[in-house]
Swiss-Prot record:
Gene that produces this protein: rplQ
GO CC, one annotated term: cytosolic large ribosomal subunit
Protein's recorded name: Large ribosomal subunit protein bL17
Superkingdom of source: Bacteria
GO MF, any single term: structural constituent of ribosome
HAMAP family for this protein: Ribosomal_bL17
Similarity section: Belongs to the bacterial ribosomal protein bL17 family.
One Gene Ontology biological process: translation
Keyword check for RNA-binding: no
InterPro entries: Ribosomal_bL17, Ribosomal_bL17_CS, Ribosomal_bL17_sf
Subunit structure and binding partners: Part of the 50S ribosomal subunit. Contacts protein L32.
Length: 136
C-alpha cells in the first residue's frame, strides 16, 4: 500500500532525480514554459511551486535556501526578483500543465508546463530579464 508516500521515482536514482528536477526548474525559470513527459511535469510542479512560495519572502536566508536547491545564480535572481514579485498576491497555483499528446517513439504522454501569467517573450535570456527588472 502506498499510504503517506509522496513523489514519483521516475525510474531513476535519487541523486539523478534531484539533479533532473533542479535542471528542469532552471529551464522553466529561464524559458517560462518547457515540454516534458507528464509524470516529470507533475513532479516539477510541486518542486517549483515550493521554490516560488519561498522566493516571495525574498530575504538572504531564502536566497541561500533556493540556491542550495537549484545551483544557478542567474535563475535564483530571476526567481526572487521577477517571479517572486509577480506572484506576490497569489497564494499558490503558479504553474499549469497542458497535455500535448504522446511521444512518437515510445508513446510516453507529453505535456507543457508553464507559469500562469507568463512572459510570452521570455526565450531563456535570464540576464536580460533581470537587467530589465532592475532598471524599472
Amino acid at each position: 500500500m502506498r499510504h503517506k508516500i509522496k513523489g514519483r521515482k521516475l525510474n531513476v536514482t535519487s541523486s539523478h532525480r534531484q539533479a533532473m528536477l533542479a535542471n528542469m526548474a532552471v529551464a522553466l525559470i529561464s524559458h517560462e514554459q518547457i515540454k516534458t513527459t507528464l509524470p516529470k511535469a507533475k513532479e516539477l510542479r510541486s518542486y517549483i511551486e515550493t521554490l516560488i512560495t519561498k522566493a516571495k519572502k525574498a530575504d538572504l536566508a531564502v536566497r541561500r535556501s533556493v540556491l542550495s536547491k537549484i545551483k544557478d545564480k542567474k535563475a535564483v535572481e530571476k526567481l526572487i526578483n521577477i517571479l517572486g514579485t509577480r506572484y506576490k498576491d497569489r497564494p499558490g497555483g503558479y504553474t499549469r500543465i497542458i497535455k500535448a499528446g504522446f511521444r512518437y517513439g515510445d508513446l510516453a504522454p507529453i505535456a507543457y508546463i508553464e507559469f500562469i501569467d507568463r512572459d510570452v517573450n521570455a526565450k531563456g535570456n535570464i540576464k536580460q530579464d533581470v537587467n530589465e527588472d532592475t532598471k524599472n
